């Protein structure tokens, strides 16, 4: 499937980019030039095209994640035709990827700190391709397992690295919108898997997946390492060059450079082992918020729905074809994240999480009722449309809130001192939850039936809503330094900025 995104369409697809890329802003006179002389008050234009390129490059890479997640649903329908594979082994085709992603999440933290964000991300392109080629050429289930493990490790690494890279390169005013692009393109990968999988068998679908890392690798060559990583390695001039590339040659970057340096100095001053400090009083709030969001993201059951969408429709006895239903869900998943990009910097993170929770709770309860009636031999033929309607609204709700926002906030709320280690912990925890949900999904259905499983997910969603209300801060419009200062100073919440700053550096 050929994807062409022209400059104008790209600008129009991201809220505020058109406005911010043309509006004039005044620079402050209180910041000094490198030679110590004060800046003159001048009119400059914000330069966002390079930030768009950086976000777009990472987002294309996120298609690998989505394709890996969406592969199972169409593949298992044809895999048992040409492979000698049992029902239990099929569950491992779905379960091995998140389990391996757990390992990737653990090793990804040290990698992004040692090698840098960019090199770590680019380094996954070749293994991704190797993993897909193993699956495509598999003559037994062991080769499929090996390919899924390799792809899974890469998924875990980039799941951690993408939000950190976005958080450290994009300006606060558009970080919400651009920060959701990786999730949007991840959903594109899921949609591609569903669409292409309706025409290709499991082997040829894997060949298709092997081609996705190529454009991602080429685009990442054009982008810089993050300024924050350079500063953490005392490579100040390279940090300045990177920031200049991201913000534009004629934009005042001195305040941002100064904030980066001060933040790093404070991190260096606190000293100590980053892992030991994860659960210190200073950093515990940010870590627990991140872990909580990851927990509720996965225990809503979304990956079980994505991995086994076709099977769920077969069980429902719905009049809607299971392959068509899977494609419709993929389309909704794809479109809804772009809706979120238009809303997140207007409504904020918390409002979208509220909407997300309510939508999922309502639809899971309704779909559970449908399966309960069917289980008790009550005729539900007249409601054959209900499973698709519920799952569409469920996926829509998830994709505008609990889908992208935990990953976005991973790059926002974790303090620089522990960012790599904490992101590694949160990512590993996320994929642990994903593995548990996907691997035990069929077992839970066997134990408490489909209606009980869906109602269990609904109760967990209620817990997620309460968690957001009482513990999750609003980060809209905040710089990373402001968020870190609030969360590490003992403040329970990060207050929302209702008015954007007049001066942007």
Swiss-Prot record:
UniProt name for this protein: Facilitated trehalose transporter Tret1
Source organism phylogeny: Eukaryota, Metazoa, Ecdysozoa, Arthropoda, Hexapoda
Keywords noted in UniProt: Cell membrane, Glycoprotein, Membrane, Sugar transport, Transmembrane, Transmembrane helix, Transport
Transmembrane stretches, start-end: 47-67, 92-112, 125-145, 150-170, 176-196, 202-222, 287-307, 324-344, 351-371, 391-411, 420-437, 452-472
GO MF entries: sugar transmembrane transporter activity; trehalose transmembrane transporter activity
Function recorded in the entry: High-capacity facilitative transporter for trehalose. Does not transport maltose, sucrose or lactose. Mediates the bidirectional transfer of trehalose. Responsible for the transport of trehalose synthesized in the fat body and the incorporation of trehalose into other tissues that require a carbon source, thereby regulating trehalose levels in the hemolymph.
Tissue expression: Expressed in many larval tissues at a low level, moderate levels of expression are seen in testis and head and highest expression in muscle.
Entry membrane topology: Multi-pass membrane protein
Membrane topology, Cytoplasmic segments: 1-46, 113-124, 171-175, 223-286, 345-350, 412-419, 473-505
Compartment(s) of residence: Cell membrane
A cellular component term, taken from the record's GO annotations: plasma membrane
GO BP annotations, alphabetical order: trehalose transport
